Amino acid sequence: MRVDKIIFIFLISFILIYPFSVKAQVPPSREIQKAQAAEEARQFIREYTARFMKLELDPFMELFSKRAVENRMLPYADIREAYRKTIEGSRSIVYSLDIDSIQTYTQSANVTGRYKIVQGFKKGGKTVFGGDIQWDLIRENGSLKIREVNYGRSW
């Protein structure tokens, strides 16, 4: 009988010390989801910048949806050709970016900012230009892709 009491007391004290968790699984709050989506968009833009500066066309173009449009008029095939020419003629590209805002939605994000590009040419010399930029990102097959990118030039 004494052993039964000891076991009973041990079980009760164990339950009191380590209560069973019966919390319901609650989805993250809307604010947490928005913060996570904004961070995912920031990471995407960092990847965009890094891939562009590596001067490798195929990995860079993987970031674009096949339905992408640039500067409200260039379709994907023309975007690819323009970047191919840019990369072929470049010795180096330094791309810097300041993000002004990120707006997130269920399956997309809109990012605005200012960019600066320093492009060194294979034939010598360099050019510097920059301006406003806006990305419209969509989720395709679980990852973000560029649906639209619009470059402005202010200098």
Regions found by a protein language model. Name each.
Residues M1-I9:
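Bacterial N-terminal signal peptides that target proteins for export
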Residues I9-Y18:
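Bacterial N-terminal signal peptides
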Residues S21-K54, E62:
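Short, low-complexity N-terminal intrinsically disordered segments enriched in polar/charged residues
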Residues Q25, S29-R30, N110, V128-W155:
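Short beta-strand edge/turn micro-motifs at domain boundaries
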Residues Y48, E56, F60-M61, A68, ...:
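Hydrophobic pocket/interface hotspot
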Residues M61-D98:
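Short solvent-exposed beta->alpha transition segments
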Residues F64, L74-P75, S101-T106, G113-I117, ...:
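A mature extracytoplasmic/lumenal domain signature
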Residues K85-G125:
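Surface-exposed, charged secondary-structure patches
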